[in-house]
Amino acid sequence: MTNPRTPILIGVGQVTEKDPPIDEASSPLDLIEQATVLALKDAGISRENLSDLTTLVVVKSFREPMRNTPEALASRINATKAAQWLAPDGGNGPQYLVNRYSEAIFSGEEDFVLLSGAEAMATGRKIVKSGNKPPWSVDSDKDADLLFADRQMWNDHELKHGIWQASHVYPLFENALRAHYGNSLPDHQIMMGELFSRLSEVAESSPHAWYPVKRSPEEIATATPSNRFVGWPYTKFMNAMNQINQSASLLLTSIEKAEEMGVDPNRWVFLHGASDVTDVWNVSYRENFYSSPSMKIMGENALNMAGLEINDIRHLSLIHISEPTRQAEISYAVFCLKK
């Protein structure tokens, strides 16, 4: 018999809003609410069920639009009884939250959890260019509670030498990888172009891709006025986009709570393996720039927990980090529809 405290993912929602008129554009809070409504629909439950949330977590935006986004969201969706947290931004953040709260649900510390986040920098930039400020703030008498400390990514030595942004650091990694592989500069550039060309092929058919355009390896690898170097050797077409209007929400709960809410078992997605690791935090202290032993350990742990090998994985999602974060904490998970 399956443990009734087994954590399951019951609903997800994703929203992409491209180039809306300024007076009709959604705020980040609007986008999160829309994604949450879609997650409810995906789970087959009603908005009233959100009053049962025990915790909601919002992943911090690059530029937080208000003093206390989790509180504003809780008020908007009538989940004021839930614990409300703001999680620092970072490429591993969403998956870390799934791993953390799945464990908390299994232990009985949590029962029903909403994980959300949004960016509306595309609209925000358009509003600023018009000479105005985004009217997105919601009054609060307190700052949002951070789920964990927002740790600085660089030390004084790195800052002194201009190594503190992702566009400063990832080129060091890439050139170390190139040297490790024994590639020439032109060969490595086209190799990166070939990789991102395959990714652009996936984006071409995705309704949520900000640029659903298939590009050739040469188009991606070659710097042009419309494809400038962002941080050599990376061109614009190799970089993640931060000036977007997108959001996502995810609902986690236990089997017994899902049954209480009447969620169809066909909607249950089980977490079969998970792992979180922290690399050597400051890059200047790392043994080299071309390998990450922690990534290897993380992948092995999650796959071993699931009883699978990498060739058994049908869908693999790798997070592409954009400014201002860079990868030091890494999370991994294996999901399956089967128990």
Predicted features along the sequence, with ranges:
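Extended, hydrophobic alpha-helical segments in both membrane/secreted and soluble proteins
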Residues: M295-L303, D312-L318, S322, R326
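Conserved catalytic cysteine-centered active-site region
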Residues: K60-K126, G131-W154, K160-S167, A221-G231, ...
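Beta-strand segments within the central parallel beta-sheet cores of soluble alpha/beta enzyme folds
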Residues: N49-V59, Q84-P88, L114-A118, H188-E194, ...
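Single conserved hydrophobic/aromatic residue that forms the stacking wall/gate
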Residues: I319-K339
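Short, well-ordered amphipathic alpha-helical segments that serve as non-catalytic structural scaffolds
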Residues: P28-I45, T69, S254, S291-A306
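Active-site-proximal alpha-helical scaffold in enzymes
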Residues: D89-E119, G162-S205, S249-K257, N304-L308, ...
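Condensing-enzyme catalytic core mediating Claisen C-C bond formation in acyl metabolism
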Residues: M1-L29, D141-K160, P171, N175, ...
